[in-house]
């Protein structure tokens, strides 16, 4: 199968399953200029299913780097009105949003972390309408991968440029279940059904806590909210439309009780954040809050994440992914959270999910917070799963039920 045919299948999957574009709906795409082939393919498929308009916002990594090198720290506290209006206005128009995750993992290496954290915090505040409508399941959004040269060279450093780029595209296609024989949309419908048994079982247990332990030193107990819900695969929006926010996805996840986390967790894979790498780090929690942390690489970046606001010191997500997931079986370190988080159990600092508590999508931020769901301007996933990870569920009477053994589900 030619690259063009694979790209067409991938684009169709993104439009029909990732975003589930509805007739007369506007589609907004954000991508780097290197991803123009994928953007054009998605645009074509979106119009085929009846999109009203496809709006594309391109970025250039070299220009972005120059911006961070030359602007002052305080300049990153200001978001231009055109930028915030672009997101907020299209969100109010019930547009759906596609993000092509294609950046160089080290695009902003060496840049003062305060510049990065200031900009990300300012964007969250200025684009509050957009983020609120995404968080409360009003607008569909989807993040997908697109191979670019610098990212490919980081993942496959011993290959030529073309070999590395081809290899990364092949890994992206394989992770998205793109092959010669099958309709990818139907494969993802089957994938959706594969989550249901485990999600339903976890929701039936009435768990009070999760207990994690592995040989890296992780030993942590995480409380769950009274009305917790696990979710997995895709999500139902308020209007009943089902979409997959991430392609690929292998995770089953929930939002824990923000005030009930005790113990220490060690990372198992590098974290690529804001164009920087954070590696070999740990977080220690007491009463739900990070009280100590360290990192062999990227300490200041990690500190910037944790210090973003009050909620960035607490967990908003725990996600269960078997060690032998299809993504991990690729035996590739992607230096990209979208892919690496689906190869490993992970947790996230920052905001939790409204869909992870009963009735949550109809609650406002204050109500969710009172129910125990964390709130923050950030949501940063980090990988902590290992081949020997053990996870027990703890019931109300204190008894344990096995969830994970040797890195994989026991059911």
Indicate where each model-derived feature is located.
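Active-site lining segments that contact anionic ligands and/or coordinate catalytic metals
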Residues: 260-262, 278-280, 287-290, 313-317, ...
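Long, well-ordered mid-to-C-terminal structural blocks that present hydrophobic/aromatic surfaces
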Residues: 253-310
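Active-site bordering "gate/hinge" segments
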Residues: 1-262, 393, 399, 409-411
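A short secondary-structure junction signal
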Residues: 109-111, 153-157, 233-235, 276-279, ...
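Extended hydrophobic packing segments that form well-structured cores
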Residues: 366-411
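Short solvent-exposed loop/turn micro-motifs enriched in small/polar/acidic residues
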Residues: 12, 203-205, 258, 274-276, ...
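Short linear motifs in exposed loops
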Residues: 223, 293-294, 404
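Dual-mode signal for accessory low-complexity, basic/Gly-rich regions
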Residues: 292-361
